[in-house]
Amino acid sequence: MVKSLLFAIGYLIFLLVTRVNVINADICSHLGYACADDNECCDKFCKGLTPTTYGICNKKPYTYRQY
């Protein structure tokens, strides 16, 4: 009983984290932004690896390149 409860909680956390990453990738592509090749912060944001924000990446030296 306890094991299944822990598994369910872990699975919900996994889904939540995965969803955050998907949202980040969607925002980036929806706005038409491409990551600068030498920009790790925005690169991770566009690829949905970290739940970061435009506010962080938009400040220098982080910049977006728009097609």
Swiss-Prot record:
Principal location: secreted
Cellular compartment(s): Secreted
Tissue spec: Abundantly expressed by teratocytes, which are extra-embryonic cells released by parasitoid wasps into their hosts during larval eclosion.
Source organism superkingdom: Eukaryota
GO biological process: defense response to fungus; killing of cells of another organism
Extent of the signal sequence: 1-25
GO cellular component assignments: extracellular region
Entry keyword set: Antimicrobial, Disulfide bond, Fungicide, Secreted, Signal
Cysteine pairs bridged by disulfides in the record: 28-42, 35-46, 41-57
Further details from the record: Negative results: does not influence host total hemocyte count. Does not influence hemocyte spread index in the host. Has no effect on humoral immune system, since it does not influence the activities of prophenoloxidase and phenoloxidase in the hemolymph of larval Diatraea saccharalis. Non-toxic to human cells, Gram-positive or -negative bacteria. In vivo, ingestion of this peptide does not impact larval mortality of the lepidopteran species S.frugiperda, a non- permissive host for C.flavipes.
Domain notes: The presence of a 'disulfide through disulfide knot' structurally defines this protein as a knottin.
Known function: This endoparasitoid wasp peptide has immununosuppressive, antimicrobial and insecticidal activities. Suppress cellular immunity which is detectable as a reduction of hemocyte encapsulation in the host. Shows moderate antifungal activity against C.albicans (MIC=4 ug/ml). In vivo, ingestion of this peptide (probably at excessive doses) increases larval mortality and reduces leaf consumption of D.saccharalis, a permissive host for C.flavipes.
Protein name: Teratocyte protein CftICK-II
Organism: Cotesia flavipes
